[in-house]
Amino acid sequence: MGFDAPTAPLPYGVAQDPGQDYPDDPHDLDPGEWARPRRRRWRVLRRIAAVLMGLAVLSVATFGVLLLITPSVNDAAARARAIDQAHHVAYPGPPVPGLFAESLVATEDHRFYSEPGVDVFAIARVTAATVTGRGDQGGATLYQQLAKMLYTPRGGGIRTEIEQVMLGIKLDLTFPKARILRMYADVAYFGHGYYGLAAASCGYFGTTPAGLTLPEAATLAGLVQGPSADDPIRHYARARGREAHVLGRLVSTGKITQAQATAAFAQHLPLVGGSGTGCTS
């Protein structure tokens, strides 16, 4: 069945009526006319790729230079021992007890066992917070915190933060994880005049690090960010709040169950407030 003459389709370039313009037949177009936008897009993409590659090369080169000029960390263990001798009797026992180590890692640096000395995601958050003026959002790994305690305790500013990042990477390349935790536990300040895990365990709870219970270990791990403000002897409620936070992080990371966290928080903290020395059990 054919079309009526007025409605039958007409070839390209032929109008239905004299006042109507039809598009040209695509086959009659100059190939260069439709190819130009595509070529422009490719040129833009190539330029973007070149810029990104240049930035990547520059970043790698900058990283290498910074790593080269950052001081060696071979004396880190000696520095930790010096802090021990200056503030308390060094903890002579085995590696950092599991309860405290797990509590510290869960709340301060949950990627500790998988990261290369620096948490790039956290660093990005800190950089964004600094640029936007929203203050410190956290982000220092245990390596960087240890680097600060050993090498730049009074430093500040972006230059010091970069140095701490590079020192943290060097610490990771030089020492095993267990040694990093041990040095951290030996030099960290826990408030109330207690430097080191041994002094804090003895001073607050009258026990050694190996004798810490779950709520005690969680409390001490929660002190490292605000040792004076969260001192459980002077600010008991704040310390319990930090304990609850650490227990929650242990639940989130799968180290304990919610029931265990609830039972631990229900226990009363047996605070002693001693000198921080003389504990043997």
Residue ranges, per PLM feature:
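Juxtamembrane regions of bacterial inner-membrane/periplasmic proteins
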Residues: 2-281
